[in-house]
C-alpha cells in the first residue's frame, strides 16, 4: 500500500498489482490512514485491473473458530464505518474489479469515479450464502436509489462500468476508451482532487451534512457467524474456491 499527502488530500493506493483483498491487516492499515488531523480528504484507488476483490476467502476458509470469522467480518464493518465517520470527503476511483467487500468500500465512499473497461462491480454475498448485515446495507443506502438498492443487494449482478454508472454504483463515468486506462485514471484523479478541494473549502457545513446522513443500525453478528459455519454455506464457498483455483 502506498500513501501520499498533498494539499490536505491523502491518496491511498491499495496496491499496484494483485487483487487488493481486504485482509484484517490491510483493513486496519486503511482505517489508521483515515486520520482527520493528518488530512482533510481521502482518495482511495486500486490498480488498473482490480480496485478490490473484497475479503480474502482463503482467510475465511482457514478460520476454524467463530472468533476468527467474527474478527474478519467485524473489521470489514469497522472499515466501512470509518469511511462514513471520517469528517472530510472519502472519494474512490474504481478503475478495476470491485467485488463484494471491494464494492462495499466503494459504496461507503462519499463519491465514486469509474471508467471504461472489462471489469465488473457488484455484491455477490447472497450467491455464496453470506448475510449482508443491515449496518452495512445502511451505509451503502445513501449511495444507491431505493428503486435499485434491492436489486444490487440481492441479485448478485456483476455490472459493467456503464451499468454501474446507471445504477448509481459510481457517480461519474469516464467512458472514452481511446485515451487509455492510464490517462483515464489520471483524469479521474484530477477530478477527485478538484472535488476534494471543493469540500475542504466548504468546511464545517460539509462535515455536519455528512454526519447527518449517518444511520445507526444494529446487527447481531453471531447470526452471520453461525450461518458461515452452516453446511450449506460451506458447500457454496468450497464451490467458489474450486472455481477460482481453476482460473
PLM-predicted stretches and their roles:
Residues 136-147:
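Hydrophobic, secondary-structure "cap" segments at the distal end of domains
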Residues 79-128, 158:
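Glycine-rich beta-to-alpha active-site loop
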Residues 111, 151, 155-157, 163, ...:
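Well-ordered beta-strand positions
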Residues 44, 105-107, 164, 240:
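Hydrophobic/aromatic residues within transmembrane alpha-helices
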Residues 2, 46-79:
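Glycine- (often His-adjacent) and acidic-residue-rich active-site loop
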Residues 1-45:
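Conserved CoA-thioester-binding segment of acyl-CoA-metabolizing enzymes
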Residues 114-119, 170-222, 238:
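C-terminal long alpha-helix characteristic of the crotonase
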Amino acid at each position: 500500500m502506498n500513501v501520499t499527502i498533498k494539499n490536505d488530500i491523502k491518496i491511498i493506493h491499495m496496491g499496484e498489482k494483485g487483487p487488493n483483498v481486504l485482509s484484517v491487516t490491510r483493513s486496519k492499515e486503511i482505517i489508521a490512514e483515515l486520520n482527520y488531523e493528518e488530512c482533510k480528504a481521502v482518495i482511495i484507488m486500486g490498480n488498473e485491473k482490480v480496485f478490490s476483490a473484497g475479503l480474502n476467502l482463503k482467510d475465511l476458509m482457514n478460520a476454524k473458530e467463530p472468533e476468527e470469522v467474527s474478527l474478519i467480518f467485524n473489521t470489514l464493518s469497522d472499515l466501512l464505518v470509518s469511511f462514513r465517520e471520517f469528517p472530510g470527503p472519502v472519494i474512490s476511483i474504481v478503475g478495476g474489479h470491485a467485488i463484494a467487500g471491494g464494492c462495499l468500500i466503494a459504496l461507503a465512499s462519499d463519491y465514486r469515479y469509474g471508467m471504461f473497461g472489462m471489469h465488473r462491480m457488484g455484491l455477490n454475498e447472497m450467491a455464496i450464502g453470506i448475510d449482508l448485515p443491515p449496518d452495512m446495507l445502511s451505509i451503502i443506502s445513501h449511495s444507491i436509489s431505493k428503486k435499485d438498492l434491492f436489486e444490487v443487494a440481492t441479485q448478485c449482478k456483476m455490472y459493467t462500468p456503464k451499468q454501474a454508472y446507471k445504477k448509481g454504483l459510481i457517480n461519474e463515468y469516464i467512458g472514452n476508451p481511446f485515451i487509455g486506462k492510464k490517462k483515464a485514471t489520471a483524469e479521474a484523479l484530477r477530478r477527485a482532487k478538484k472535488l476534494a478541494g471543493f469540500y475542504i473549502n466548504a468546511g464545517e457545513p460539509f462535515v455536519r451534512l455528512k454526519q447527518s446522513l449517518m444511520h445507526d443500525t444494529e446487527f447481531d453478528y453471531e447470526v452471520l457467524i453461525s450461518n458461515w459455519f452452516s453446511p450449506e454455506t460451506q458447500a457454496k464457498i468450497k464451490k467458489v474456491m474450486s472455481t477460482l483455483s481453476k482460473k
